[in-house]
Regions:
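Key DNA-contact positions within bacterial/archaeal DNA-binding proteins
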Residues: 40
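Basic amphipathic alpha-helical segments that dock to polyanions
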Residues: 45-50
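Short amphipathic alpha-helical interface segments
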Residues: 10-22
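Residue cluster at the C-terminal edge of the helix-turn-helix DNA-binding motif
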Residues: 51-54, 82
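Beta-hairpin "wing" of winged helix-turn-helix
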Residues: 54-62, 66-67
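Conserved segment of winged-helix/HTH DNA-binding domains
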Residues: 71-96, 109, 115-116
Length: 146
């Protein structure tokens, strides 16, 4: 499976926004410091996230970004798709005339990987930023008890 840093970092940055601000804009510098993602990379990601109406921006000394919707309404798949990330587990595409190995037939495990891709997409479609936040809260409270 291939999910590049672009998709992972976009989800991390959006989760950071969801966790650390409710109404006040958050600067990319703040996100960069907390998440360890370069500002230049965040600028590229947030350009696409804003274009896809997942965040709103404001300029000025107290400017930054806020989520355009509540965290429970932002699906992880929409974040990943917004930054042009495709989740692929097979080389070939269904609409392609050539199959997995460049021949006219699919490889023997094609359906396995194709089904896995469908499950991964379904997972990201069924989970929101809220799910990330609540899982983090549960995990951190477990660590405190130990």
């Amino acid at each position: 499976m291939k999910l590049t840093s672009r998709g992972r970092y976009a989800v991390m940055a959006m989760a950071d926004l969801a966790k650390n601000n409710v109404k006040e804009p958050t600067s990319l510098t703040e996100i960069s410091l907390r998440q360890g993602i370069s500002i230049a990379y965040l600028e590229q990601l947030f350009l696409k996230l804003r274009k896809n109406n997942l965040v709103q921006s404001s300029r000025g000394p107290s400017g930054g970004y806020v989520l355009s919707k509540p965290p429970g309404e932002i699906k992880l798949l929409s974040i990943i798709s917004a930054v042009d990330e495709k989740i692929k587990t097979v080389k070939c595409r269904k609409e392609s005339k050539k199959a997995c190995n460049g021949k006219s037939i699919k490889c023997i495990t094609h359906n396995l990987w194709d089904d896995l891709e469908a499950h991964i997409n379904e997972f990201f479609e069924n989970n929101t930023l809220n799910d990330i936040l609540f899982k983090e809260v549960r995990n951190s409270s477990k660590e405190l008890k130990q």
